[in-house]
Amino acid sequence: MSRTKFRLVRYFLERPSGIILFLFCVLMGVLTASGTKAQRNVVVVRPKEIHDTLTNPGMGITTFQRFNGQELNPPLKWSEVGPVAKLAPAATTPDFPPTSVSYCRWYWNVLEPEPGKFDWKIVDLAISEARAHGQKLAIRLMPYSNQDSLPEWFKKSGAKRANKDSDKDGKIWQPDFSDQLYLKYWSELVAEAGARYDGNPYLDSVDISSVGYWGEGWSPYMPAFPFQKALIDIWLEAFKQTPLLMNFDEPEALAYGTQHGAGWRLDCWGDMRVSSTDPYFPAEMLEIYPQQIVRTGIQDVWQKSPVSLETCYTVPGWKERGYDVDYILEQGLRWHVSTVNIKSAAIPAEWKSKFEDFQKKIGYRFILRRMEYAKVVRPGIMMPVHMWWLNGGVAPVYNQYDLVVELRSSRQSARIRIPVDVRRWLPGDSVFDGSVYVPEDLADGAYDVRIAMLDPRTGAPAIRFAIEGRQEDGWYAVGSITVKNSEPME
């Protein structure tokens, strides 16, 4: 120590206040040195965001009554008849976005042609075809429509009819929805479907189908609410694992279904009429829908259960009518939509860029903004990890996926699960500040650091992130780390 430094130390030590100041300076020096060393052992990565359209499970534009790569519908027409056999691929690549969900629906008379004899091969085939085309299946079972009859055996079962042949709608046999035989036979179909398909990992969602044409929940012959409730309860009982979607039409029923865990769907998205004289086809987008969402209290249902929209007409039909596509798409985002059924009709060329932008916003969109971890780590200890994620979409992901960090070298690898529930990642920022255990059997050496969200059933990467670095196996490379058994951890 130099003479000057010695005199300075003695000066501090000869005074009580100086001793305190001296010790403080020594402590700060130690902490500064320790902090500097710790900072040297930290890696901070900031992946570069990408702006691609991503195909991810449970979100996006769906195919309708068909699967990826198959022939599209004409611009202004579609069929309500679901597929009952394999469909051939299109002769040329369809002008349609790739999608993770196929939405199909079938009539009761097809699924149960004789009482108690269910033709589930139809739905089994659709699930198989969806898997073969890289999709999951969303379904609705429909009692009848204005063109498709109830099963003949049901009409002869003693069930009550609500209308007569001489009525304006007499060509279609309208059931009495308060009749116990309707509840009995329809609930048997629903119960059988639930026993066979509830929890199937390749089933995306199931519509709650109850009253009226297509099971949409409206009819000139509406029963009192207790009967509607009973027809909703059979679905809640049959499907306790697969997400259910409540149809929008009847307010009290909509509120009841969503209060019991269902998401919701509507089937006239894009109807921009400002008035209507038809009580069963009111002006939807500019009258019914926005106000009914508030009046039924379902504004926040999207936070835990999905929202799905189906076009009124088709997208080319919107264009033909001169509808404001910007307003329609914006409204869908405001409702926090995850999936949209545009009836497998091609999007008009002039609107493609608008739909591409829309697809980048619907559902969830995960972006890793920042990740911090140790540069050198010793096996068998807890390692601090900090992550900042952004969900740039308008909805959460509704199924559980495991967020995993993988340490991989040419000789071995280890997967470390991050203890977060990604279903809680609402739009906006989410942060993980915690520590994870580094497996004790890791050998010394350099390891790549990779991340993924894994399907907990298969252990395979399931979610595409909006960042660079995706590798062929679906993992994202974010950095590197050194494992060193002798490394002291500060």
Predicted features along the sequence, with ranges:
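Aromatic-lined substrate-binding rim segments of carbohydrate-active enzymes
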Residues: P89-D165, A224-L236, P243
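The substrate-binding groove and active-site-proximal loops of carbohydrate-active enzymes
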Residues: Y107-W120, G170-Y185, G212-A224
